[in-house]
UniProtKB/Swiss-Prot annotation:
Zn(2+) binds at residues 406, 409, 422, 428. InterPro entries: BRCT_dom, BRCT_dom_sf, DisA/LigA_HHH, DNA_ligase, DNA_ligase_CS, DNAligase_adenylation, DNAligase_N, Hlx-hairpin-Hlx_DNA-bd_motif. DNA ligase that catalyzes the formation of phosphodiester linkages between 5'-phosphoryl and 3'-hydroxyl groups in double-stranded DNA using NAD as a coenzyme and as the energy source for the reaction. It is essential for DNA replication and repair of damaged DNA. This is DNA ligase. The keyword DNA damage applies. It holds the Pfam family DNA_ligase_OB. Keywords: DNA damage, DNA repair, DNA replication, Ligase, Magnesium, Manganese, Metal-binding, NAD, Zinc. The active site is at residue 121.
Length: 662
């Protein structure tokens, strides 16, 4: 075959695979086969000097540009007017209603009833892509002033989900948002000398970086939502425009809603606000736009904004505030971690007074100092995180000093990697109390009525220094504890006695093996079936267990090497603790070996019971939808997982359909 023809075929094939993987989330080729074809293309291009402008090899160059050139947009990129209350949305809606009524009263060609299209308002950097009459990407530009932006074509090409060639023979400008996902952000920050402060800065800084190789390191993504300019037949509705964007292979978010009433809009605002922190990218609101294009054209624009759209803005996810102090706390493992004490600040509707700082390396890398103004970010975490400092606020600030002794017991601290530990396991109150509370917890030994206050008293007054000491407690001594009468003392002893008969997975979880949670404990028990087998397990055997990686495997091996660990386990067994494992016979079913996600409220099952049912049928129950998901069982008020499953073409079952299958 002619080498130029072969290059053209390889380019077409590789671009198809990229679309499947980065846009559809479902690849039809293995990574190995893709790499083989990619490097075949690289070699052919070197040999012949023939390179197509839309070849995947042109995505990343080792180039540093001298400057950004200006680009004049064919159609202006408008800002949107903003609302922060439903009342402001109502006022905007009423203006639209009034316009529509007046127009239809005086015009022969009536406008259709108002219908709004709702999409997420992404918190990234707006980009405008231009495609020529052959469908080839020729320019990528920032929004800039709205009329003139900066040419960032080389940077835009590093975004792998953006098509370099599309099936369209009209000159086209399409608008979207370049974003950084939380995964890309965390990976970049784990390796970077200077960590990024937030996802938006990560995206904006990447596209406005003259070093294209640095842009590529940030692994940006993008969503597209608007055709700014298109030669040829115009669109009649926004939904028609969105369908066009999708059919041309551009990455789109799966959330698009049609609303006709304010009540419907309110429900969608509430829904997106609820799932906002579950997303793996930042949004700062919702865009509400009129669907009918003719109505849009007649409504027109103000000097700044289109009259036919408005953005509903959520509360900020990030804020700046003053770092007042650092508090050092001891965890169950003995790790001593810093917590920032902040000047109270409102963040995403919550008053934030504390934030995590991770460790001294993290503090040094981010340049955090006492008295400085710091950037605080709230995501899925219960406690927000400090991302960096405001450079202008550093004058007069103080260095954060690392403690040399344990803040709880005064023992000397030791370094292990980036963390510091207190090794006074038996005499350090926070360590022992948290260990006992974990051991007694519902998903561990399930000792009813046990509390942290009880654990504190057992440590302070009854000299409990190990979990096995719980099984040596005496009735008379319990009566010496605060608020412990005869009934409460006996109830606690009965609950401790009852806990002796436990499942092996609960016992394993109760031991507090580092990095071993409830699910991992269950998976380990299924694989090894006895404590003795697990104690003898090799590294290779451990990593063969589903979801057990190198770190977890090493944690388990190190845990069972400890002489004290084995002593405690043997003592627990000698005191009558009887962990047992009953091998459940898994019935043949359509769910055998399948990955299943449950979303919404089911009529006949709690979350625990449906999980147990699915596992008894041989299924793996997952908490998130991906291209590896086989089924989604959807109940009432199914949320974003349902939407994602639909967009990926995953089989969605109602509760009734699920029961019919089994």
């Amino acid at each position: 075959m002619d080498k130029k023809k072969l290059i053209e075929e390889l380019v077409e094939e590789l671009n198809k695979y990229a679309y499947e993987y980065y846009v559809l989330g479902n690849s039809s080729v293995t990574d190995k086969d893709y790499d083989k074809k990619y490097y075949e293309l690289v070699d052919l291009e070197k040999e012949t000097g023939y390179k197509l402008p839309y070849s995947p090899t042109q995505r990343v160059g080792d180039v540093i540009l001298p400057e950004f050139k200006k680009y004049t947009h064919k159609a202006r990129l408008w800002s949107l007017d903003k609302a922060q209350t439903l009342e402001e949305i109502r006022e905007w809606h009423n203006r639209n209603v009034k316009f529509l009524e007046e127009y239809n009263r005086t015009s022969d060609e009536e406008l259709p009833p108002l219908k709004y299209i709702l999409t997420k308002k992404f918190d990234g950097l707006t980009i405008n892509l231009s495609y020529d009459e052959n469908g080839v990407l020729i320019t990528g530009a920032t929004r800039g002033t709205g009329a003139i932006g900066e040419d960032v074509t080389a940077q835009v090409k590093t975004i792998k989900s953006i098509p370099l060639k599309i099936d369209c023979h009209d000159f086209l400008e399409i608008h979207g948002e370049a974003i950084m996902t939380t995964e890309a952000f965390e990976k970049y920050n784990s390796e970077a000398d200077t960590p990024l402060k937030n996802l938006r800065n990560g995206a904006a800084g990447a596209l406005r970086n003259l070093n294209v190789a640095e842009t590529a390191k940030r692994n940006l993504s993008a969503f597209f939502y608007d055709v700014g300019y298109k030669e040829g037949a115009p669109f009649k509705t926004y939904m028609e425009m969105l369908n066009f964007i999708k059919t041309k292979g551009f990455p789109m978010d799966d959330y698009i809603r049609e609303c006709k009433t304010l009540d419907e809009i309110q429900k969608e605002i509430d829904y997106i606000r609820d799932i906002r922190f579950d997303l793996n990218y930042d949004i700062d609101g919702l865009v509400i736009a009129i669907d009918d294009i003719r109505t849009r054209e007649l409504l027109g624009y103000t000097v700044k904004f289109p009259k036919w759209a408005i953005a509903y803005k959520f509360e900020a996810q990030e804020a700046t505030t003053k770092l007042l102090d650092v508090e050092w706390n001891v965890g169950r493992s003995g790790r001593v971690s810093p917590t920032a004490i902040l000047e109270p600040v409102e963040l995403a509707g919550v008053t934030v007074k504390r934030a995590t700082l991770n460790n001294m390396d993290d503090i040094a890398r981010k340049g955090v100092r006492l008295g400085a103004e710091v950037f605080v970010r709230r995501s899925n975490d219960v406690i927000p995180e400090i991302m960096g400092v405001v450079p202008e606020s550093l004058e007069g600030t103080k260095e954060i000093e690392e403690p040399k002794v344990c803040p709880a017991c005064g023992a000397h601290l030791v370094h292990e990697g980036v963390h510091i530990y207190c090794e006074n396991t038996l005499g350090c109150k926070p360590q022992m109390v948290k260990t006992i509370v974990h051991f007694a917890g519902r998903e561990a030994m399930n000792i009813a009525g046990f509390s942290e206050r009880t654990a504190e008293q057992l440590f302070e007054k009854l000299d409990i220094r190990d979990i096995s000491d719980l099984y040596k407690l005496e009735y008379e001594k319990l009566l010496d504890l605060d608020k412990f009468g005869p009934k409460k003392a006996q109830n606690l002893l009965d609950a401790i006695e009852k806990s002796k008969d436990c499942t092996l997975e609960a016992f394993l979880y109760s031991l507090g093996i580092p990095n071993v949670g409830v699910k991992t404990a269950k998976d380990l028990v299924k694989r090894f079936e006895s404590l003795e087998n697990l104690e003898k397990a090799t590294f290779e055997e451990l990593v063969s267990v589903q979801d057990v990686g190198d770190i977890v495997a090493r944690s388990i091996i190190e845990f069972f090497k400890e002489e004290r660990t084995l002593k405690v386990i043997n003592e627990l067994l000698s005191l009558g603790v009887n962990p047992h494992y009953e091998k459940k016979e898994v019935l043949e079913s359509p769910f055998m070996g399948k990955t299943v996600v449950v979303t919404g409220t089911l009529e006949n099952y709690s979350r625990t019971s449906i999980k147990e049912k699915l596992e008894s049928l041989g299924a793996k129950v997952s908490g998130s939808v991906s291209k590896k998901t086989d089924f989604v069982i959807a109940g009432e008020a199914a949320g974003s997982k349902y939407d994602k499953a639909k967009s990926l073409g995953i089989t969605i079952l109602s509760e009734e359909e699920f029961e019919n299958m089994i």
